Amino acid sequence: LAAFVTVKTGRPALVILDRKENFAATTTRHAMEMRVSLGADRDGTLRAIKIENMSNTGAYGEEGPPVTMVVANNILPSYNRARAIYYNGRTIYTNMVAGGALRGYGASWQTSWA
């Protein structure tokens, strides 16, 4: 709508959504619960990492599985010296606002616990 008005008038246009429209028409980040277990040698060298990730993609969110996979792709290379690596990512669909693709696609969760 804003693009149409801008083209027709030659002036910038702004769309302002009320709270109800905002939740109905936009997406959120995927809520995630991560459980991380680390194993190390006596000298402190990281040798094992286990990550269990549950991603809430909301209702009808098609970005859920890709975001869960991108989280693994962003986290696991950081620990390339670990001899044992385990990642289990699950995406669940709930009666919440749908999660969608935002900036830093799948990257913000890796820094939340590291």
Each predicted region: which residue ranges?
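Structural alpha/beta core scaffold segments of enzyme domains
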Residues: L1-A114
